From Swiss-Prot:
This is Uroporphyrinogen decarboxylase. Pathway: Porphyrin-containing compound metabolism; protoporphyrin-IX biosynthesis; coproporphyrinogen-III from 5-aminolevulinate: step 4/4. Gene3D superfamilies: 3.20.20.210. The gene is hemE. Catalyzes the decarboxylation of four acetate groups of uroporphyrinogen-III to yield coproporphyrinogen-III. It comes from Edwardsiella ictaluri (strain 93-146). It catalyses: uroporphyrinogen III + 4 H(+) = coproporphyrinogen III + 4 CO2. One of its GO terms (biological process) is protoporphyrinogen IX biosynthetic process from glutamate.
Length: 354
């Protein structure tokens, strides 16, 4: 593989010295970019875009042509894993993801296969390999998966949910069934992420979008336990260097210590978490990623720069910070404002690395 020209992101994940704070944005390849919308229209729909390695590569690279980002992230979707288990993923306009088949009982869970990532998810590996070749070592490539708990919520609910009543009904009435599902998903995610690493991903991230809807006790039992299982099962070295892993639980700021105990390299923070407090609590053990409110990108440029300075000052001097949004960028944000954010991170962070 080509030697990496900019390894700032990987170094920061391992709390090694960098010249400026690295930055990337969750959903940086997305609907806020007109060129993304044109490529998606060319593909026909979102799923077709994910399954076409050349077009998935194109949209992965689009934000890097506009902004001096320090990492690329694979263009895909967290729901590729349940789709590969036979649930039939599709998207309703204005409704988000849906499954043709939901998981409703113990027998459904027992029937679920553990997908072979080189077969049922081979299109993802093709995309990873295509992106790595096209990056030519400019920046590292991040692979990712959803967490078992988050994937299970979509599988049991049949799609997006506001109240999570169906999965919580299973959790409280038949916890053994839910544990069986979560264990199958953890095994599937280990295989999936390790295949991404073999295909060329240089870091991986686990998105636990819905862990924050649980109580602390239930979070440890039904979400964190299975992310820990994944971290333990991951290939942590490739191409002669460590492959860092980041955990991100939206709404998980109260559980940072327990998350750091998994042995991950970094924690993603949402915007409700104070980064100075997070560093005091776990900064000696893990790097921190985040954590500007994505809605701040609607603000005038001066306000965006002010917020970047506040976050950088909150983390303070030294290593182990990757600047990012606290969740995905909104589709109607002006691309110019995303550029202001990225440029401000690099320019304003210089004094923190002397």
């Amino acid at each position: 593989m080509t030697e990496l020209k900019n390894d700032r992101y990987l170094r920061a994940l391992l709390r090694q010295p960098v010249d400026v704070t690295p930055v990337w944005m969750m959903r940086q390849a997305g609907r806020y970019l007109p060129e993304y919308n044109a490529t998606r229209a060319q593909a026909g729909n979102f799923i077709a875009l994910c399954k076409n390695a050349e077009l998935a590569c194109e949209v992965t690279l689009q934000p890097l042509r506009r902004f001096p980002l320090d990492a690329a992230i694979l263009f895909s979707d967290i729901l590729t894993v349940p789709d590969a288990m036979g649930l039939g993923l599709y998207f309703e306009t204005g409704e988000g993801p849906r499954f043709t088949h939901s998981v409703t009982c113990h027998a459904d869970i027992q029937r679920l296969p553990i997908p072979d990532p080189e077969q049922e998810l081979g299109y993802v590996m093709d995309a990873v390999r295509t992106i790595r070749r096209s990056l030519r070592g400019d920046v590292p490539l991040i692979g990712f998966s959803g967490s078992p708990w988050t994937l299970a919520t979509y599988m049991v609910e049949g799609g997006s949910s506001k109240a999570f009543t169906k999965i919580k009904k299973v959790m409280f009435s038949d916890p053994a069934a839910l544990h069986l599902l979560l264990d199958k998903l953890a095994q599937s995610v280990i295989l999936y992420l390790n295949a991404q690493i073999r295909a060329g991903a240089q870091a991986v991230m686990i998105f636990d979008t819905w862990g924050g809807v649980l109580t602390g006790r239930d979070y440890r039992e039904f979400s964190l336990r299975y992310m820990h299982q994944i971290v333990d099962g991951l290939q942590r070295e490739s191409e002669g260097r460590r492959v860092p892993v980041t955990l991100f639980t939206k709404g998980g700021g109260q559980w940072l210590e327990a998350m750091a105990d998994t042995g991950c390299d970094a924690l993603g923070l949402d915007w409700t978490c104070d980064i100075a407090d997070a560093r005091r609590r776990v900064g000696g053990r893990v790097a921190l990623q985040g954590n500007m409110d994505p809605s701040l990108l609607y603000a005038p440029p001066a306000r965006i720069e002010q917020e970047v300075e506040t976050i950088l000052a909150g983390f303070g001097q030294g290593e182990g910070h990757i600047c990012n949004l606290g969740h995905g960028i909104h589709p109607d944000v002006p691309p110019k404002h995303a550029g202001v954010f990225v440029d401000a991170v690099h320019r304003l962070s210089v004094p923190y690395h002397r």
